[in-house]
Amino acid sequence: MSTDDREIEVYRAPVYRPGDKVIARKQVKNDGTMAGFEIGDIVVKKGDVGYVRDIGVFLSQFYIYAIDFIERGSIVGM
């Protein structure tokens, strides 16, 4: 699949804004990018509540949301 075949998400406004409340739809495991957790550790469980802290861009194509899961004490890029 070429880049031309995929939607460029950043051509439209982000779905979420900083401060928005979000709920995890899936469990998230550490892929090795989160300090303080072993690879494979669960960092977010389905149903956990978090708040959008920041919005970044990945590969000039996709939005990445920094979600602050306050009760877990972790910020996860999703």
From Swiss-Prot:
GO terms for biological process: nitrogen fixation. Keywords: Nitrogen fixation. It comes from the Bacteria. The keyword Membrane does not apply. InterPro entries: Nitrogenase_MoFe_mat_NifZ. It holds the Pfam family NifZ. Belongs to the NifZ family. This is Probable NifZ protein. It comes from Rhodobacter capsulatus (Rhodopseudomonas capsulata).
